[in-house]
């Protein structure tokens, strides 16, 4: 009895050493389907299949047979070769996610491109408007310059005419002044001779 008990304990220890327990997430490989068995080895009977890329829960592994006990989404427990499991999702299951990511990125790039084109068009329109305003200001400035030149010519012509009129008026005043002065001198010379002669005539008549 003690020997049998010792042998039993030894077998339990060996089995505990050979099988490791750990509940982790694993993914079935990309093969069309994978057979699962009722125990950790090829000699155990087949109990069904799991789909490629299916997510399963790793319950334990057997290092001697390289089998793993898994539980699928329906709660079924079976054994599957370790090489048929992966820590990463299968390519088949990741394709839709990758396609969605590509679509999302494509939409973002399209939006960025549309926004950039819109902003570029707005900037070009603003530049065109600015050029139009600048050209208008240049034309207005040139127009004002031309008007200033014309006004300056008119001022110069008016100044010349004013100078001529002033000279004419001055000459006329000189002429009038000279005439009055000459007449005064003439009267000053003639009147003294005329007045005494009248006095003498008056005396003779008396």
Swiss-Prot record:
Predominant localisation class: membrane
Where does the signal sequence lie?
A: 1-22
Stored Pfam families: SH3_3
What membrane topology was assigned to this protein in its record?
Single-pass membrane protein
The answer on whether this UniProt entry bears the keyword Electron transport reads: no
Q: Which Gene3D superfamilies match?
A: 1.20.1170.10, SH3 Domains
Q: Which UniProt keywords apply?
A: Membrane, Signal, Transmembrane, Transmembrane helix
Segments crossing the lipid bilayer:
169-191
* A cellular component annotation (GO) from this entry: cytosol
**SH3b domain residues:** 23-89
User: Where does it localize?
Assistant: Membrane
What does the sequence similarity comment in the record state about its family?
To H.influenzae HI_1605.
Name under which the protein is recorded: Uncharacterized protein YgiM
Record the organism.
Escherichia coli (strain K12)
